[in-house]
Amino acid sequence: MSEPIKPRIDFEQPLEPPQEPVLRANVAFDEQQAEHFFPAAPELQQEEEEGRAEGIINAALKPKRSLWRKMVTAGLTLFGVSVVAQGVQWVHTAWVQQDWIAMGGGVAGGLIVFAGVGSVVTEWRRLYRLRQRAEERDVARELLHSHGLGKGREFCEKLARQAGLDQGHPALQRWQASLHETQNDREVVALYAKLVQPVLDNQARREISRSAAESTLMIAVSPLAVVDMAFIAWRNIRLINRIAALYGIELGYFSRLRLFRLVLLNIAFAGASELVREVGMDWMSQDLAARLSARAAQGIGAGLLTARLGIKAMELCRPLPWLEGEKPKLGDFRSQLIGQLKDTMKKSDNKAK
């Protein structure tokens, strides 16, 4: 049976033709602008947002230079100059009057002052070296998006010297053998990041893994909370020192405090959401909360926090930014910590039996 014919439909207005999209006028780039042009990447935008937010936190926590602080600084400077001038006059008077005891005291005081000035200069140099590492990361980030020639190799060779790698190192030789004259700065730095930089990164990963495992086992078996806190603090400071030394940074007192502050600030900025996202689902899936004791769970948490501290220290001490897929995650250390803790618990149960 055939379908009935549909009635005719009359439109009150005529159909309008489809409108073509309005295109913006073309823009011509010169050679200088084209050299610095690179496509937008979501991960780069995320890094810029994180850096901007971290800068806001740093600015908020940094004490403002008030008038009273400037007056105190000027007063201390004037007092120091007066002490030095008085010491010089004292030594001169003792020399004229042949008061050898007073002269010996003045010389001893002068040696102490010179030693203090030398310590301040050394601390300033180490602190400047830590700040210079952040500038080197910015330079490396620019070179990774540059199409120029000639700057990448010189920059990478300087990084190799800072890391203490001699010309006979196998990784450095592989990198030099892979270079060609036609490669631009981006390709040269990327090759260095893939062939040479992992040598130091793997050593830092082993340090983080060992410190995290020691923190986990210590918290799991120790009955004293005060001992736990002291041990974790000592291990974390030692971990930061060793990671900084691996990347060629010599830490002094103030530079160590600054690096530790930056690490804690970075962790606070990232928040606990990343820790919950990477660890929480795995713990729930394996039902570890039902099988591990409270002390064991605290040990795993302390170990993961130590690992996170080490990862952030790596990020601040590395001369190169992380490439895609290179940044270590807590999941890389999670299974190892859980396995070591389970083995320790099994051994303790067997000894008890």
Curated annotation (Swiss-Prot):
Keyword Membrane: yes
Presence of the UniProt keyword Transmembrane helix in the record: yes
Sorted UniProt keywords: Cell inner membrane, Cell membrane, Membrane, Transmembrane, Transmembrane helix
Subcellular location: Cell inner membrane
Transmembrane segments: 71-91, 101-121, 214-234
Any single Gene Ontology cellular-component annotation: plasma membrane
Membrane topology of the entry: Multi-pass membrane protein
Family: Belongs to the UPF0283 family.
Descriptive protein name: UPF0283 membrane protein Spro_2618
Source species of the chain: Serratia proteamaculans (strain 568)
